[in-house]
Protein backbone atom coordinates (compact mmCIF):
# COMPACT_ATOMS: atom_id res chain seq x y z
CA UNK A 1 0.00 0.00 0.00
CA UNK A 2 1.38 3.37 -0.96
CA UNK A 3 1.95 6.04 1.63
CA UNK A 4 0.41 8.84 -0.43
CA UNK A 5 -2.13 7.94 -3.11
CA UNK A 6 -2.63 10.88 -5.42
CA UNK A 7 -5.75 13.02 -5.15
CA UNK A 8 -6.43 11.82 -1.62
CA UNK A 9 -7.11 14.10 1.31
CA UNK A 10 -4.09 14.84 3.47
CA UNK A 11 -3.47 15.27 7.14
CA UNK A 12 -3.21 19.00 6.55
CA UNK A 13 -6.67 19.50 5.04
CA UNK A 14 -7.25 22.16 7.66
CA UNK A 15 -5.03 24.30 5.44
CA UNK A 16 -7.42 23.93 2.53
CA UNK A 17 -9.32 27.12 3.27
CA UNK A 18 -6.31 29.40 3.13
CA UNK A 19 -7.11 33.03 2.52
CA UNK A 20 -5.55 34.51 -0.60
CA UNK A 21 -5.40 38.04 0.77
CA UNK A 22 -2.20 39.97 0.26
CA UNK A 23 -1.21 40.39 3.89
CA UNK A 24 -1.42 37.71 6.61
CA UNK A 25 -3.56 38.20 9.66
CA UNK A 26 -1.54 38.95 12.81
CA UNK A 27 -2.47 35.61 14.36
CA UNK A 28 -1.17 33.58 11.44
CA UNK A 29 2.03 31.65 12.01
CA UNK A 30 4.93 31.90 9.58
CA UNK A 31 4.19 28.35 8.43
CA UNK A 32 0.62 29.25 7.49
CA UNK A 33 1.81 32.32 5.61
CA UNK A 34 4.49 30.34 3.78
CA UNK A 35 1.89 27.73 2.82
CA UNK A 36 -0.48 30.39 1.48
CA UNK A 37 2.26 31.92 -0.65
CA UNK A 38 3.38 28.52 -1.96
CA UNK A 39 -0.01 26.89 -2.55
CA UNK A 40 -2.39 29.73 -3.33
CA UNK A 41 -1.00 33.13 -4.12
CA UNK A 42 2.20 32.40 -6.03
CA UNK A 43 2.02 28.68 -6.75
CA UNK A 44 3.39 28.73 -10.32
CA UNK A 45 5.90 31.49 -9.63
CA UNK A 46 7.41 29.81 -6.59
CA UNK A 47 7.65 26.46 -8.35
CA UNK A 48 9.50 28.04 -11.30
CA UNK A 49 11.78 30.11 -9.08
CA UNK A 50 12.75 27.02 -7.10
CA UNK A 51 13.55 25.25 -10.36
CA UNK A 52 15.93 28.09 -11.19
CA UNK A 53 17.34 27.89 -7.67
CA UNK A 54 18.56 24.40 -8.52
CA UNK A 55 20.71 25.81 -11.32
CA UNK A 56 22.42 28.18 -8.91
CA UNK A 57 23.55 25.25 -6.78
CA UNK A 58 25.02 23.58 -9.88
CA UNK A 59 27.38 26.53 -10.40
CA UNK A 60 29.39 25.39 -7.37
CA UNK A 61 31.78 22.52 -8.25
CA UNK A 62 31.81 21.16 -4.69
CA UNK A 63 28.03 20.76 -4.84
CA UNK A 64 27.78 19.49 -8.42
CA UNK A 65 30.42 16.83 -7.70
CA UNK A 66 28.31 15.45 -4.87
CA UNK A 67 25.23 15.38 -7.10
CA UNK A 68 27.21 13.68 -9.87
CA UNK A 69 28.42 11.01 -7.43
CA UNK A 70 24.96 9.46 -7.13
CA UNK A 71 24.42 9.45 -10.90
CA UNK A 72 20.71 10.09 -10.35
CA UNK A 73 20.50 13.46 -12.08
CA UNK A 74 21.91 11.97 -15.28
CA UNK A 75 20.38 8.49 -15.29
CA UNK A 76 16.99 9.22 -13.67
CA UNK A 77 16.60 13.01 -13.69
CA UNK A 78 12.80 12.99 -13.41
CA UNK A 79 12.87 10.79 -10.32
CA UNK A 80 15.63 12.85 -8.72
CA UNK A 81 13.71 16.07 -9.35
CA UNK A 82 10.40 14.64 -8.15
CA UNK A 83 12.01 13.32 -4.98
CA UNK A 84 13.56 16.69 -4.18
CA UNK A 85 10.33 18.56 -4.85
CA UNK A 86 8.20 16.11 -2.87
CA UNK A 87 10.45 16.10 0.19
CA UNK A 88 10.35 19.89 0.37
CA UNK A 89 6.63 20.01 -0.44
CA UNK A 90 5.83 17.63 2.42
CA UNK A 91 7.38 20.05 4.92
CA UNK A 92 5.51 23.10 3.70
CA UNK A 93 2.16 21.38 3.09
CA UNK A 94 2.04 19.58 6.43
CA UNK A 95 4.32 21.65 8.66
CA UNK A 96 7.90 21.28 9.85
CA UNK A 97 6.96 19.46 13.04
CA UNK A 98 4.09 17.39 11.66
CA UNK A 99 4.60 13.65 11.43
CA UNK A 100 5.04 13.84 7.66
CA UNK A 101 7.27 16.89 7.92
CA UNK A 102 9.55 15.15 10.42
CA UNK A 103 9.75 12.03 8.26
CA UNK A 104 10.65 14.12 5.20
CA UNK A 105 13.36 16.04 7.03
CA UNK A 106 14.74 12.77 8.40
CA UNK A 107 14.85 11.32 4.87
CA UNK A 108 16.68 14.40 3.63
CA UNK A 109 19.14 14.34 6.52
CA UNK A 110 19.86 10.66 5.88
CA UNK A 111 20.78 11.42 2.27
CA UNK A 112 23.03 14.30 3.28
CA UNK A 113 24.71 12.25 6.02
CA UNK A 114 26.30 9.99 3.38
CA UNK A 115 28.52 12.85 2.25
CA UNK A 116 30.88 15.32 3.86
CA UNK A 117 29.05 18.56 3.13
CA UNK A 118 30.36 21.85 4.47
CA UNK A 119 28.00 23.98 6.52
CA UNK A 120 28.45 26.96 4.20
CA UNK A 121 27.45 24.80 1.22
CA UNK A 122 24.34 23.59 3.03
CA UNK A 123 23.47 27.13 4.05
CA UNK A 124 23.91 28.37 0.49
CA UNK A 125 21.53 25.76 -0.92
CA UNK A 126 18.99 26.67 1.76
CA UNK A 127 19.43 30.37 1.01
CA UNK A 128 18.50 29.85 -2.65
CA UNK A 129 15.10 28.53 -1.56
CA UNK A 130 14.54 31.81 0.27
CA UNK A 131 16.17 34.34 -2.04
CA UNK A 132 15.15 33.08 -5.49
CA UNK A 133 11.35 33.19 -4.94
CA UNK A 134 11.66 36.69 -3.46
CA UNK A 135 13.75 37.88 -6.42
CA UNK A 136 11.48 36.21 -8.98
CA UNK A 137 8.36 37.82 -7.54
CA UNK A 138 10.07 41.22 -7.46
CA UNK A 139 10.65 40.86 -11.21
CA UNK A 140 7.80 38.71 -12.53
CA UNK A 141 5.10 38.32 -9.89
CA UNK A 142 1.67 39.89 -9.97
CA UNK A 143 3.06 41.73 -6.96
CA UNK A 144 6.16 41.38 -4.78
CA UNK A 145 5.96 39.75 -1.38
CA UNK A 146 5.13 42.14 1.43
CA UNK A 147 7.78 42.61 4.10
CA UNK A 148 5.84 40.40 6.54
CA UNK A 149 5.55 37.70 3.87
CA UNK A 150 9.28 37.85 3.17
CA UNK A 151 9.98 37.43 6.86
CA UNK A 152 7.56 34.49 7.11
CA UNK A 153 9.18 32.83 4.07
CA UNK A 154 12.60 33.34 5.64
CA UNK A 155 11.49 32.03 9.05
CA UNK A 156 10.04 28.89 7.49
CA UNK A 157 13.30 27.98 5.77
CA UNK A 158 15.35 29.03 8.77
CA UNK A 159 13.27 26.55 10.76
CA UNK A 160 13.98 23.91 8.15
CA UNK A 161 17.69 24.72 8.37
CA UNK A 162 17.67 24.26 12.14
CA UNK A 163 16.08 20.84 11.74
CA UNK A 164 18.70 19.95 9.14
CA UNK A 165 21.42 20.70 11.67
CA UNK A 166 22.89 23.68 9.82
CA UNK A 167 24.96 25.76 12.21
CA UNK A 168 25.39 29.53 12.30
CA UNK A 169 22.07 30.27 10.63
CA UNK A 170 21.52 34.01 10.04
CA UNK A 171 19.03 35.62 12.38
CA UNK A 172 17.83 38.10 9.77
CA UNK A 173 16.76 37.88 6.13
CA UNK A 174 19.12 40.71 5.15
CA UNK A 175 22.08 38.77 6.53
CA UNK A 176 21.03 35.63 4.66
CA UNK A 177 20.89 37.61 1.41
CA UNK A 178 24.30 39.14 2.10
CA UNK A 179 25.84 35.73 2.69
CA UNK A 180 24.10 34.33 -0.40
CA UNK A 181 25.65 37.05 -2.57
CA UNK A 182 29.10 36.71 -0.99
CA UNK A 183 29.07 32.93 -1.43
CA UNK A 184 28.24 33.21 -5.12
CA UNK A 185 30.99 35.75 -5.76
CA UNK A 186 33.51 33.47 -4.08
CA UNK A 187 32.40 29.99 -5.10
CA UNK A 188 30.85 30.19 -8.58
CA UNK A 189 33.33 28.76 -11.07
CA UNK A 190 33.21 26.42 -14.04
CA UNK A 191 33.54 22.65 -13.77
CA UNK A 192 32.70 19.66 -15.92
CA UNK A 193 30.25 18.34 -13.32
CA UNK A 194 28.44 21.69 -13.29
CA UNK A 195 27.71 21.32 -16.99
CA UNK A 196 26.69 17.66 -16.75
CA UNK A 197 24.16 18.16 -13.96
CA UNK A 198 22.83 21.44 -15.33
CA UNK A 199 22.39 20.02 -18.84
CA UNK A 200 20.47 17.00 -17.54
CA UNK A 201 18.22 19.27 -15.46
CA UNK A 202 17.62 21.73 -18.30
CA UNK A 203 16.65 18.91 -20.64
CA UNK A 204 14.31 17.56 -17.96
CA UNK A 205 12.53 20.91 -17.59
CA UNK A 206 12.20 21.19 -21.36
CA UNK A 207 10.63 17.72 -21.46
CA UNK A 208 7.71 19.10 -19.43
CA UNK A 209 6.75 21.21 -22.46
CA UNK A 210 8.54 19.98 -25.60
CA UNK A 211 9.32 16.72 -27.42
CA UNK A 212 13.00 15.85 -27.17
CA UNK A 213 13.69 16.74 -30.81
CA UNK A 214 12.72 20.36 -30.07
CA UNK A 215 15.04 20.78 -27.09
CA UNK A 216 17.42 22.83 -29.23
CA UNK A 217 14.71 25.49 -29.53
CA UNK A 218 13.93 25.56 -25.83
CA UNK A 219 17.46 25.75 -24.43
CA UNK A 220 17.95 29.46 -25.23
CA UNK A 221 14.64 30.20 -23.48
CA UNK A 222 15.84 28.69 -20.21
CA UNK A 223 19.26 30.29 -20.66
CA UNK A 224 17.52 33.66 -20.96
CA UNK A 225 16.45 33.35 -17.32
CA UNK A 226 20.01 32.82 -16.09
CA UNK A 227 22.54 35.56 -15.37
CA UNK A 228 25.98 35.74 -16.97
CA UNK A 229 27.89 34.40 -13.95
CA UNK A 230 25.57 31.40 -13.82
CA UNK A 231 25.81 30.71 -17.55
CA UNK A 232 29.59 30.89 -17.46
CA UNK A 233 29.88 28.58 -14.44
CA UNK A 234 27.70 25.94 -16.07
CA UNK A 235 29.20 26.25 -19.54
CA UNK A 236 25.92 27.39 -21.12
CA UNK A 237 25.83 29.73 -24.10
CA UNK A 238 24.35 33.17 -23.65
CA UNK A 239 21.05 33.41 -25.56
CA UNK A 240 20.58 35.86 -28.42
CA UNK A 241 19.55 39.29 -27.17
CA UNK A 242 16.15 39.09 -28.85
CA UNK A 243 15.40 35.78 -27.09
CA UNK A 244 16.27 37.17 -23.66
CA UNK A 245 14.21 40.31 -24.32
CA UNK A 246 11.21 38.27 -25.54
CA UNK A 247 11.26 35.86 -22.59
CA UNK A 248 11.54 38.60 -19.97
CA UNK A 249 8.90 40.73 -21.71
CA UNK A 250 6.54 37.76 -21.84
CA UNK A 251 6.90 37.13 -18.12
CA UNK A 252 6.27 40.80 -17.31
CA UNK A 253 3.19 40.77 -19.56
CA UNK A 254 1.93 37.69 -17.71
CA UNK A 255 2.40 39.52 -14.40
CA UNK A 256 0.29 42.45 -15.59
CA UNK A 257 -2.45 40.15 -16.86
CA UNK A 258 -2.59 38.26 -13.56
CA UNK A 259 -3.43 41.46 -11.70
CA UNK A 260 -6.80 41.46 -13.45
CA UNK A 261 -7.60 37.83 -12.71
CA UNK A 262 -9.02 36.37 -9.49
CA UNK A 263 -6.53 34.82 -7.13
CA UNK A 264 -6.38 31.09 -6.52
CA UNK A 265 -8.35 30.12 -3.42
CA UNK A 266 -8.03 26.33 -3.50
CA UNK A 267 -4.49 25.28 -2.56
CA UNK A 268 -2.39 23.64 -5.25
CA UNK A 269 -0.54 20.85 -3.50
CA UNK A 270 2.52 19.55 -5.30
CA UNK A 271 2.23 16.31 -3.35
CA UNK A 272 -1.09 15.64 -5.11
CA UNK A 273 0.02 16.25 -8.69
CA UNK A 274 0.18 13.17 -10.95
CA UNK A 275 3.77 12.11 -11.55
CA UNK A 276 4.95 9.43 -13.98
CA UNK A 277 7.66 8.55 -11.46
CA UNK A 278 5.03 7.49 -8.92
CA UNK A 279 1.81 6.60 -10.79
CA UNK A 280 0.30 5.01 -7.67
CA UNK A 281 1.69 7.40 -5.08
CA UNK A 282 4.83 7.31 -2.98
CA UNK A 283 6.27 6.66 0.44
CA UNK A 284 8.39 9.32 2.08
CA UNK A 285 10.92 6.70 3.17
CA UNK A 286 11.38 5.60 -0.45
CA UNK A 287 12.16 9.08 -1.80
CA UNK A 288 15.66 10.16 -2.71
CA UNK A 289 18.92 8.27 -3.07
CA UNK A 290 20.30 5.38 -1.06
CA UNK A 291 23.73 3.88 -0.57
CA UNK A 292 24.27 1.29 -3.33
CA UNK A 293 20.54 1.60 -4.06
CA UNK A 294 19.74 -0.72 -1.18
CA UNK A 295 16.51 -0.14 0.78
CA UNK A 296 16.47 1.82 3.97
CA UNK A 297 15.59 0.35 7.32
CA UNK A 298 13.04 2.06 9.49
CA UNK A 299 12.97 1.48 13.24
CA UNK A 300 9.98 0.80 15.41
CA UNK A 301 9.65 2.59 18.72
CA UNK A 302 10.72 -0.66 20.42
CA UNK A 303 13.94 -0.73 18.40
CA UNK A 304 13.09 -3.57 15.98
CA UNK A 305 13.96 -2.97 12.30
CA UNK A 306 11.28 -3.46 9.65
CA UNK A 307 11.28 -3.46 5.86
CA UNK A 308 10.07 -0.34 4.02
CA UNK A 309 7.13 -2.24 2.52
CA UNK A 310 5.40 -2.46 5.90
CA UNK A 311 3.07 0.24 7.17
CA UNK A 312 5.26 3.04 8.55
CA UNK A 313 2.91 5.64 9.94
CA UNK A 314 3.62 4.55 13.52
CA UNK A 315 7.38 4.29 13.04
CA UNK A 316 10.02 6.71 14.09
CA UNK A 317 10.98 9.07 11.30
CA UNK A 318 13.99 7.15 10.05
CA UNK A 319 16.61 4.63 11.03
CA UNK A 320 19.92 3.74 9.44
CA UNK A 321 20.90 2.66 5.95
CA UNK A 322 22.09 -0.75 4.86
CA UNK A 323 25.58 -0.72 3.35
Task: Go through each PLM region and give its residues.
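Mature, function-bearing regions of proteins
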Residues: 1-323
Amino acid sequence: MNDVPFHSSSASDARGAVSSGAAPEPAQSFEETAFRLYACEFSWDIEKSLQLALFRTYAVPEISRILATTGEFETRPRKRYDDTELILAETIEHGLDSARGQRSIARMNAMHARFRIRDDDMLYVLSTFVCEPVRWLDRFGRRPMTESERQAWFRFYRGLGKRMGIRDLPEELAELKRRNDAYERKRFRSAETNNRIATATRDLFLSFYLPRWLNWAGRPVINALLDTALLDSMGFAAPPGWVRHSVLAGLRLRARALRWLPQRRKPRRLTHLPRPTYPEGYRIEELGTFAKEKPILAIRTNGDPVAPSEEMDTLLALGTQVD
